[in-house]
Amino acid sequence: MSGALDVLQMKEEDVLKFLAAGTHLGGTNLDFQMEQYIYKRKSDGIYIINLKRTWEKLLLAARAIVAIENPADVSVISSRNTGQRAVLKFAAATGATPIAGRFTPGTFTNQIQAAFREPRLLVVTDPRADHQPLTEASYVNLPTIALCNTDSPLRYVDIAIPCNNKGAHSVGLMWWMLAREVLRMRGTISREHPWEVMPDLYFYRDPEEIEKEEQAAAEKAVTKEEFQGEWTAPAPEFTATQPEVADWSEGVQVPSVPIQQFPTEDWSAQPATEDWSAAPTAQATEWVGATTDWS
C-alpha cells in the first residue's frame, strides 16, 4: 500500500507507539472477515493484529479523507467515551464535523429534523457501537471508514483499519495517527519534522480521576505552603534600647538609702560569769523533788 516509497514506510518510533498503546492486542473472539489482519494467537487466546496491515489501511483511509475537497463533509463519530475526545481533537485538527456521544437516528436519512446532514465520508470508532450511522450510511450510499477489532462486524464498512478499539490509549493513538497522516498528505505539516501535537491530547481521561488528581494537587500545594510558612516565617525583631547618657563619667544616678545604725559592744570587756556552785533556784528543786520519787 505504501508503494515501496521510503517516505510512506512505517518508522520505528511509530511501531513503538503502537506497542506502547497496545494497538496490536485484539480480543479473544475473531470474525471471519478479520482473519486476514491477524498475525498470531497468544497462549491465553488473545489475537495479535499485524501492524503492517494496520499501517497500510491507515494510509488508505488518510488518502480517502484527503480526497474530499471540503473537510467539513467528513463526519467523524464516536458514541463510546473512549473515543469522544479523540474525535473532537481530530475534527479540530483536520476541519471535519464531529458527532461525539449519542447519534440521533435519522441524521443521514430524515430530512425533516434539524440535525439532518449529508456528509460525503463517514469515519466511526467502533462498528458495533456505531451501528446506527453505518446502517444509515448504507441507505444513502455513503462510504465508511471504521476502526475494527478482531471481533468487529465488517458489514457496511468500506475501509477497515485493524486495531484495538477498546483501549483508551489505542483509540486515541489511532485517531492521532490518522490526523497526522491527513495533515501530511495535505502538506500542512512536513514529514521531516515531528508533529508538535502529542498523542496524550487524544487520550480519554475519566472525569473522576481528573477530579481526584486536582484535589490531590490542591492538598499538596496547601501542605507545601503550610510547611514553608512554619520555617520561613520572619523572626521577631528584638531591639535593645540603650539609655542615652550624655556624660558617661556621671553614670546612672543610684538612689541613696539611709544606713541603719546598730549599737556596738565592747568585745574586750570581761563577760559576766555566773556562780555555778550557788544553790539551785526554787523552780529547779521542785522538778528534782518530783522526779526522785520513783517508788
Swiss-Prot record:
Start and end residues of each stretch annotated as Disordered: 266-295
Outcome (variant: residue 58 to F): In ICAS; reduced protein levels
Modified residues (N6-acetyllysine): 52, 89
Modified residues (Phosphoserine): 43
Site positions (Cleavage): 115-116, 133-134
InterPro entries: Ribosomal_uS2, Ribosomal_uS2_C, Ribosomal_uS2_CS, Ribosomal_uS2_euk, Ribosomal_uS2_euk/arc, Ribosomal_uS2_flav_dom_sf, Ribosomal_uS2_vert
Consequence of changing residue 54 to N: In ICAS; reduced protein levels
Keyword set, alphabetical order: Acetylation, Cell membrane, Cytoplasm, Disease variant, Host cell receptor for virus entry, Host-virus interaction, Isopeptide bond, Membrane, Nucleus, Phosphoprotein, Receptor, Repeat, Ribonucleoprotein, Ribosomal protein, Ubl conjugation
An example Gene Ontology biological process: cytoplasmic translation
Molecular function via GO: DNA binding; laminin binding; laminin receptor activity; ribosome binding; RNA binding; structural constituent of ribosome; virus receptor activity
UniProt-annotated stretches for the region Interaction with PPP1R16B: 54-113
Post-translational modification: Acylated. Acylation may be a prerequisite for conversion of the monomeric 37 kDa laminin receptor precursor (37LRP) to the mature dimeric 67 kDa laminin receptor (67LR), and may provide a mechanism for membrane association.
[DE]-W-[ST] repeats: 230-232, 247-249, 266-268, 275-277, 293-295
Alphabetical list of HAMAP family matching this protein: Ribosomal_S2_euk, Ribosomal_S2_laminin_receptor
Binding partners and assembly: Monomer (37LRP) and homodimer (67LR). Component of the small ribosomal subunit. Mature ribosomes consist of a small (40S) and a large (60S) subunit. The 40S subunit contains about 33 different proteins and 1 molecule of RNA (18S). The 60S subunit contains about 49 different proteins and 3 molecules of RNA (28S, 5.8S and 5S). Interacts with RPS21. Interacts with several laminins including at least LAMB1. Interacts with MDK. The mature dimeric form interacts with PPP1R16B (via its fourth ankyrin repeat). Interacts with PPP1CA only in the presence of PPP1R16B. (Microbial infection) 67LR interacts with capsid protein of Adeno-associated virus 2,3,8 and 9.
Protein name according to UniProt: Small ribosomal subunit protein uS2
